[in-house]
A protein has these predicted regions:
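Conserved alpha-helical substructure of the radical SAM core
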Residues: 7-90, 94-105
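Generic structural signal for well-ordered alpha-helices
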Residues: 75, 103, 129, 164-167, ...
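Radical SAM enzyme [4Fe-4S]-AdoMet core and its adjacent flexible, acidic
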Residues: 1, 148-262
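Hydrophobic "anchor" residues
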Residues: 274-275
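Conserved strand-to-helix beginnings and helix N-cap segments that scaffold or border functional pockets
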Residues: 96-100, 125-126, 199-200
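Short, acidic, Ser/Thr-enriched surface-loop or helix-capping motifs
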Residues: 269-270
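Core AdoMet radical
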Residues: 38, 58-67, 81-96, 106-124, ...
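Intrinsically disordered, low-structural-confidence terminal and linker regions
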Residues: 1-7
Length: 277
């Protein structure tokens, strides 16, 4: 992951948190592979933003995007896998050449096709919204905060308003509306070294405030901690926060979450066609 995310060297720190394996053992838990149900496809690191928290260091200057030949190989693999879910991510998948045809070919191969959308990149692709509706794609969009200041500080000036505009377009197409069958989920991650708040309470707050202030509706909210890799790890190291953040993550271990870890039932294809379990 460090190689994929860009050049960075491990940063020494005074106290290494207990290993994940050690934490599992201390809690009487085992991490075992379950049935593979999900194929995640990372179509590349090209993005229209350069977020400080990005764990793959995506950005406008990245040239790593999935080729048509690799897309064909992924399609062939998906046909053999009988996956319940195909999950397309990036970078900003909206910017990858040929993404429309790729989605068309993947849609019949799994009951659920997920698209992890970049709302500012999607703003320039109304054709993709029409395609999402036709293919019944589940749209999962990053929306970090309910106010412009923290959102723009994390992303870039103007991102908050541009994201709201795209959410309105998705709502107008039926996404996030009761009874439409078109699922729109949001993902919120905190700024800096904060950990996310309780997901249920935060989902209620997002539902309430987005509807009241902006007239926007959605289905689910997922709150995620920032992963200490890539550009975010570099920032943690340069700002002197890496050791404390790792300790904070280790100290916040939730044994109830182990059964739901993505690595138990997911395989991932990178932009260059490498397959990971």
């Amino acid at each position: 992951l460090t190689e994929i995310a860009g050049p960075s060297r491990p940063t020494p720190y005074r106290q290494i948190p207990d290993s994940f394996a050690g934490t599992l053992a201390r809690n009487g838990l085992e991490l075992r592979r379950a049935e593979t149900t999900t194929l995640q496809v990372n179509v590349g690191f090209l993005c229209d933003q350069s977020c400080r928290h990005c764990h793959v260091s995506a950005g406008p200057g990245r040239t790593e995007v999935m080729s048509r030949g690799t897309m064909d190989a992924v399609e062939s693999f998906a046909r053999q896998g009988a996956f319940a879910v195909i999950d397309v991510t990036g970078g900003a998948p909206e910017l990858v050449p040929g993404i429309e045809g790729f989605l068309e070919r993947l849609a019949p191969l799994a009951p659920r096709l997920l698209f992890r959308a970049n709302l500012t990149a999607l703003a320039a692709r109304p054709d993709l919204v029409d395609l999402f509706v036709r293919l019944r794609v589940v749209v999962i969009a990053s929306f970090p905060a309910l106010d412009a200041d923290p959102a723009d500080a994390q992303r870039a000036p103007g991102v908050f308003e541009a994201s709201l505009a795209t959410l309105r377009v998705l709502n107008a197409a039926g996404y996030g509306r009761v009874g439409s069958g078109l699922e729109l989920d949001l993902v919120a991650n905190p700024s800096g070294t904060l950990l996310p708040p309780d997901q249920s309470a935060e989902e209620e707050r997002f539902h309430r405030e987005l509807a009241a202030v902006h007239g926007i509706t959605f289905n689910r909210l997922y709150t995620l901690a920032n992963v200490p890799l890539g550009r975010f790890r570099s920032w943690l190291a340069s700002s002197g926060h890496l050791e404390d953040y790792l300790q904070q993550l280790a100290g916040s271990f939730n044994p109830c979450a182990v059964d739901g870890l993505m690595c138990r039932n997911l395989v991932s294809v990178a932009w260059d066609g490498m397959l990971y379990d």
